[in-house]
């Protein structure tokens, strides 16, 4: 193992001892935010430190067995022990290298998931509704909380645009590769001739911003408009100006929220979405600069990229980034996304490992 990697692992082992001591103090829960940060850090370090302990044990086993080589009666046994221990060390080192890959600081965050109907008119809006159901069912399987923040329903059902907040540990880490263009090929319910139509939606996955640390919004940069919330077809659902539209003047970003009867709560939610969009914008600009140096297949998150095709007549979903086709469209549309999301995460890790190899 490289000296730099050994040094890093020793530091992490020492840090784990420090965290254990801090968590064992009587006043450990006096500051709940700090307590949560420590427990999260401990959960991240624990598997690394456990694997490192196993690697060191295997190294000790090699040393012990080598001392037996001089004994003719024990030589064959010692050689077998050395071979087995070195194989364990090789396996553990590869796993440790994976565990030490740079972590995305947003991985633990809640997310705002935005789905917009694109080309295809009413069929695209219906597909936006299908995508929302797919992600909602997946969230339910993870025992996450789902909140609709903003919705613009279409006349025939589905959504022109919908934003939901998904609350749960690791929400961003699981769904961050869903940003991009989603294309559907199927016979629309409104199609009398039975012809297959192609339409598309755009999905954006944005980590929830920390209001204190991530994004500071100057009130002078905002224009705040209030208006009456309306339902499908333009009917008014209440008689007060409870709906809120925020315009961020420097960037031109606009957020509307009208799902709550309280203007105050609608404004709070709109501010949360705006902060997430601003954070997302900053990070995508940074990623674009990085991508100019090294093109990432999985993690570009470019909204214009067509990432996936849902072909209903053939019963398949194809993710174009990793050339993966799964012939179980009904299960996938019902939220059974584990295999697909796992394959994307594995490919991303492979890219990271390859990049580390290039740097070495």
UniProtKB/Swiss-Prot annotation:
NCBIfam families: prfA, PRK00591.1. Disulfide bonds: none annotated. Peptide chain release factor 1 directs the termination of translation in response to the peptide chain termination codons UAG and UAA. Keywords: Cytoplasm, Methylation, Protein biosynthesis. Methylated by PrmC. Methylation increases the termination efficiency of RF1. Residues 280-293 have a biased composition (Basic and acidic residues). Its main location: cytoplasm. The gene is prfA. The keyword Cytoplasm applies. This is Peptide chain release factor 1. The modification N5-methylglutamine is found at residue 235. SMART domains: PCRF. InterPro entries: PCRF, Pep_chain_release_fac_I, Pep_chain_release_fac_I_sf, Prokaryotic/Mito_RF, RF-1. One of its GO terms (molecular function) is translation release factor activity, codon specific. GO terms for cellular component: cytoplasm. HAMAP family: Rel_fac_1 (MF_00093). It is found in: Cytoplasm. Belongs to the prokaryotic/mitochondrial release factor family. Residues 280-305 are annotated as: Disordered.
């Amino acid at each position: 193992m490289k000296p730099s990697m050994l040094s890093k692992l020793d530091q992490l082992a020492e840090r784990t001892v420090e965290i254990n001591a801090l968590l064992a103090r009587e006043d450990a829960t006096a500051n709940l935010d700090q307590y949560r940060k420590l427990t999260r850090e401990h959960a991240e370090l624990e598997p690394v430190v456990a694997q490192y302990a196993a690697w060191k044990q295997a190294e000790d086993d090699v040393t012990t067995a080598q001392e037996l080589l001089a004994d003719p009666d024990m030589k064959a046994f010692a050689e077998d022990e050395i071979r087995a221990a070195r194989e364990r060390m090789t396996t553990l080192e590869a796993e440790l290298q994976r565990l030490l890959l740079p972590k995305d600081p947003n991985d633990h965050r809640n997310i705002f998931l935005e789905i917009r109907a694109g080309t295809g008119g009413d069929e695209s809006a219906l597909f936006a509704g299908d995508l929302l159901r797919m992600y909602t069912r997946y969230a339910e399987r993870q025992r996450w909380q789902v909140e609709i923040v903003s919705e613009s329903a279409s006349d025939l059902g589905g959504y022109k645009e919908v934003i939901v907040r998904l609350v749960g540990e690791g929400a961003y880490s699981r769904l961050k590769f869903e940003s991009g263009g989603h294309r559907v090929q199927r016979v629309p319910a409104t199609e009398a001739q039975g012809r297959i139509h192609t339409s598309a939606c755009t999905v954006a996955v944005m980590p929830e911003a920390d209001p204190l640390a991530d994004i500071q919004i100057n009130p002078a940069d905002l224009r705040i408009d209030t208006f009456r919330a309306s339902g499908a077809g333009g009917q008014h659902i209440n008689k007060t100006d409870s709906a809120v539209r925020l315009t961020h003047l420097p960037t031109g970003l606009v957020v509307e929220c009208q799902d709550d009867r309280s203007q105050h709560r609608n404004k709070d939610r709109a501010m949360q979405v705006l902060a997430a969009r601003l954070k997302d914008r900053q990070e995508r600009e940074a990623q674009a600069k990085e991508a100019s140096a090294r093109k990432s297949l999985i993690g570009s998150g470019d909204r214009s990229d067509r990432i996936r095709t849902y072909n209903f007549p053939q019963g398949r979903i194809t993710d174009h980034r990793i050339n993966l086709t799964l012939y179980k469209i009904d299960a996938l549309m019902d939220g059974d996304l584990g295999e697909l999301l796992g394959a994307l995460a594995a490919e991303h890790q492979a890219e990271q490992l390859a990049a580390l190899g290039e740097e070495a």
